[in-house]
Each structure stands twice: as C-alpha cells, then as structure tokens.
Amino acid sequence: MFENFLSFSRGGTPCHVDSFRLLLDIRVSIERMLDQRMLTTLGISFSQGSVLVQLAGGGTVSQQDLAKALGCGTSRISRLVHDLPNREWVVCRPGRGDRRTRNLSLTPAGLALARQIPSVLAQAGQAVLGRLSVEERRVLGASLARMLDEVRKPRR
C-alpha cells in the first residue's frame, strides 16, 4: 500500500528517504509477515487474532468497546468478527438494553486458539530481532519507547 510512498529503487536497491518512512516500511513489512505466519500457523489473520486475544481477557465485550480497545472503527470490527461465529470461535449476542448492540465472547475453541497466538508472535519477534545483538535490541527498545512517548503526548 505504501511502497511507492516509502521507498524508491536505484539500481535495484531500495533507498529509504528518511527514518520516518523507514519506520512505516518496517510496520507494513511486519504486518505482512505477521499475517502470513498467523494464516499459515492458525488459519486466521493477524487482525482476527488481535480480536481473539482481546476477547480472551474474559467476559463479554460489546463491538464498540472492542473497537476502542483495538483502536479501530466499529465497521472494521464488524468485518473482522463476521466470520468468527461461523468458525465457532466467537459468540455474538444482541445487547440487552439496545438490540442494535452486539456483544461478543469467546467459545472454548476460540479461547484455545487465542492461547496459541503468543507463541506465533514470539516466533515472529525472533525472526525480526533475532540477528540483533543484546545491545542493539536495548538501544532499539529505548529509542522506540521514547518515540512512542512522543507520539502519545497530547498536542495543542
């Protein structure tokens, strides 16, 4: 999606314009890798896995609350959740006070699947970071944490 914006090629070698675009490129590449690993290993997309992990926190969650927790819109959640009841991983029920509200909870099979996701993510993390030294990981972690703090600061 962002490939043309993120990088261009000179002599077959990608040249990243700046660090920010490099970060975007890394994000896109990691998301693709996670999707591929999740689909291959568990038969679900990374986004669907995120839904299952969030629901594994316990109890029943409204689609609206799930969207807030995952930082996306309710229409995106509707699309992600659409197939999960058919695969018997999630139960969708209308809300008690408002029938338009949909409440979601995991089935035992959905919980079992959600419990497999952390190991797939750990393997992906090792694939991405495994060749970095301990010191490189430390510096990267500190830099990324600082950047995240900056991004999360309230702006006027």
Across the structure, where does each feature detected by a protein language model lie?
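C-terminal regulatory/oligomerization modules of transcriptional regulators
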Residues: 1-12, 135-156
